[in-house]
Every structure is written in structure tokens, then in C-alpha cells.
Amino acid sequence: MCLLTQTLTLQLGNHTEKNAPSVEGALEIYYFDVGQGDSTLIKQSDDYMLIDAGNNEDGQKIVNYLKDNLHIDNIDYLIGTHSHEDHIGGVDTVIENIDIKNFYLPHETTLEKKSIQDVYKVAKEKNLQITNPQIGSSFQLGEAKCEIVFVDNNEPEEKNNSSIVLKITFGSQTFLFSGDAEYDVESKLDVGKINIYKAGHHGSKSSSTADFIKRIDPDYAIISVGYLMN
């Protein structure tokens, strides 16, 4: 079965707004159609980041697309936003088949569901260290700055609100990926203007409140959602 994607390519070169950092090349973002789930690939220069990997049945489709269509054998950063199956279900398959340099996941000790158990098992087999990122930490993906603007490593009762929220800045353009973070998290975020917003929690009413949307003022929003889901 093929994997449908929606691709966004942002070519800035030196054409950035005044006072914005000068960057070269393009930022490519692949939004994978995994139904009621999330998976996004980001490329800048020769660096790759995969945010989530959909449901269990999506893992092999994502691997096939990465290898066969994009000829990717390694990923610099793999981000599991939180432990729900529709986000990390395919992560174990990705780890089994793609060389991962850095793996970020919120701290969790209960490991109640098989999906997260599988992820920990495969990571251990591959000697892949799991990093529990901290708010304010950042890293570079090529010339794109990636900042952890929220994560809860204290295992909140609502797993959605443990989600890693990632802000990416490329030249003058900003992007926000918020996993399934709900309004309690959104109320704490101070991320400024966002050009392209990956809508939290599949566009459900528990996220993307009117106040939050007003504050980030996105130019575009991307919603990853299953057929006839609302």
C-alpha cells in the first residue's frame, strides 16, 4: 500500500525579512497521510527529522517511502511527541529499519500500552538512547533552529499534555508542531507569530482554542485527521 504525502518546500535563500537570520537552501516538510494519526518528515540541507510515525500499521509504509522514494537510510532526529499509539505506533518499525542518531521522547515509566513497550524494546536492542528533552533546549537541523517550547516529563494523567511541542525557525519563517497538546498546555505557550501551524490533537476541540490561534496568528494550519473524524 502506498503512502500519500503533502509536501511543503520553503525556499528562502537570502530573501528573508529584515533582521531575520540569513539562510541558504530550502526547508522541505512532508506531511504523511496516516489517517487518524501524525507523522511529519522535515529536511534541511542533508539533515532529516521525523516527528511521530503514525499508527502501528503505518510504520512499514513510512519506512518504504523514506527508503524507496527519498532514499533515506538515516535520520538525525526522531521525535516521539508522546506515547499514544497514533503517534508512536510506527516508531519501532522506523527504528528497526532506519539508522537513528537522536531519539526524543517524554519521560515515562508506566509503559502501559504495547505500542510504547515495543518502542522501548527496539530502542534497547538497537542501543539507541532515549533522550527526555527539557523545555528551552534546542538543536540545529541544518540551518533551521528547533526549540523545545514545551514538554512534561512528570507523566501527567492526561498523556496528551506530556507532548513535546517543537518550534522551528528557518530564516524569517516559523513553524509549530504540538503533538496532542491541549488547551492547558496552549495557555502556557509564548511562541510569538507562527507562519505554519501543525494543529494540535488532530484539530479537535480540546486544542487550537480561539485565544491560542489569536496569539500565534498562523498563516496556514495543517490538520492530520482520519476520514469522517471531527
Predicted regions and their residues:
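Non-globular, low-confidence helical/coil segments that flank catalytic cores
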Residues: C2-N230
